[in-house]
Amino acid sequence: MQLNHPIRQALLSVSDKSGIVEFAQGLVKRGVKLLSTGGTAKLLAENGIPVTEVSDYTGFPEMMEGRVKTLHPKIHGGILGRRGIDDEVMMQHQIDAIDMVVVNLYPFAATVAKPDCTLEDAVENIDIGGPTMVRSAAKNHQHVAIVVNNSDFNAILAEMDQNRNSLTLETRFDLAIKAFEHTAQYDSMIANYFGQMVKPYFRAEEEAEAKCGQFPRTLNLNFIRKQSMRYGENGHQKAAFYVEQDVKEASVSTAKQLQGKALSYNNIADTDAALECVKSFSEPACVIVKHANPCGVALGKDILEAYNRAYQTDPTSAFGGIIAFNRELDEDTAKAIIERQFVEVIIAPTVSSAAQEIVKSKKNVRLLTCGNWESAIQRLDFKRVNGGLLVQEADLSMVDLADLEVVSKRQPTKQELEDLLFCWKVAKFVKSNAIVYAKNNQTVGIGAGQMSRVYSAKIAGIKAKDEGLEVKGCVMASDAFFPFRDGIDAAAKVGIECVIHPGGSMRDQEVIDAANEHNMVMVLTKMRHFRH
């Protein structure tokens, strides 16, 4: 079996035309004849590139406003024909072999993302001929190269030069995988979009409204493997890191690594927790995370001050932690970190060249930049359970001063309100049951992941005491309501003066009474932030 087949004829039909003119010129320069359709053929001809319209080749015009272009035996016979097996039938029906197919599909995702997109708009952007050609060419990858990514153009031309106008079987197989990934993702987008819709002419209007939403009846996900890992959460577990395509928001998935060892499974999980927390703050902020829990968070006039204050919360836990900033990492801050502690990962929107030079002295430290961010983009969160997948909206909601309800007799001061909001933002990122003590925009003690809320409160106090931090005058945040007054009593005992929590317990009044007995401020958010 001949493994390499010279490319003599190619069919080009693309929606994304970036780079297609240069690629077509490169093919013609290498003696390849071109077939093309509609807008692609017009663009090539306008640039002086010799091209044959598919309709001229098949003798059958494009019809139905372009719905039928390439669905013809002379096209699919040329793509699917097996060299050395189907030659006679191809000759009998005057079918020329097509050795390369260059196709990308109608922009369905971009169309349905438009606020004014109608169902009719979506339907007209469902590609039929394109996926059919892609699948045909990918199926016959033994003989045909299928190109769906414009980013592959240069590499393909370079390989053709090295292989007498051929591509290796290994390359054609890799291109076929990309093609099936491309069509799978495309069909998934369509299925997800239609799965969210129930038209009123199918059901009663009220039921249709209830059924509509962002959760389709079948969920199709497409992620691309970015990294294979030495192991997973533990050494005996195999693991890999997959990312979504075209993510615009600054994230651990889109971050650029400037130096250091490859990120581990736990590094990525912890870095995500640190970065998402620090993104909550507009002032210069630092978040230090260990095992996906913040162990120190603070604001400052600059990130050096924020780092020093965050580290002060729990230096023991900060050892081997992840540090995230919401401003550029500068030389002074980088120096303070490297001289003070062992750190696994540092992530910031940008890193100054001087800071990068400082961090280079510790070659194993993973240094990442994620770019700047604006407001958070709504997305879905997933949690795998045995045999299923829990799906929910990401918890992006926060409260501001206007949302707070003061239920205690004592009213908070301006500084106390500022600290309460700071503390509440941190509590959102602490594993439940979560209790956070803070003062002057600095965490003082954090109690995480306890089965009872009162023990989280006690642990926050113990942590503060162990580090010699003053709890008296601090505020306290709880990610969920206090079911009993014991958490308030425990907090008052160590000197907490203000409490923020969602409220909503059957015993709310008992909890409020406890706050009043201790002359504490109590503020309700009416929003819970469980984190499991």
From Swiss-Prot:
Gene Ontology terms: biological process: 'de novo' IMP biosynthetic process
InterPro entries reported for this sequence: AICAR_Tfase_dup_dom_sf, Cytidine_deaminase-like, MGS-like_dom, MGS-like_dom_sf, PurH-like
Superkingdom of origin: Bacteria
SMART domains assigned: AICARFT_IMPCHas (SM00798), MGS (SM00851)
GO cellular component, as recorded: cytosol
Keyword Hydrolase: yes
Domain (MGS-like) ranges: 1-148
Pathway connected to this protein: Purine metabolism; IMP biosynthesis via de novo pathway; 5-formamido-1-(5-phospho-D-ribosyl)imidazole-4-carboxamide from 5-amino-1-(5-phospho-D-ribosyl)imidazole-4-carboxamide (10-formyl THF route): step 1/1; Purine metabolism; IMP biosynthesis via de novo pathway; IMP from 5-formamido-1-(5-phospho-D-ribosyl)imidazole-4-carboxamide: step 1/1
Record-linked PANTHER family: BIFUNCTIONAL PURINE BIOSYNTHESIS PROTEIN ATIC (PTHR11692:SF0), BIFUNCTIONAL PURINE BIOSYNTHESIS PROTEIN PURH (PTHR11692)
Family membership noted in the UniProt record: Belongs to the PurH family.
Name of the protein this chain belongs to: Bifunctional purine biosynthesis protein PurH
Organism from which the protein derives: Histophilus somni (strain 129Pt)
Gene: purH
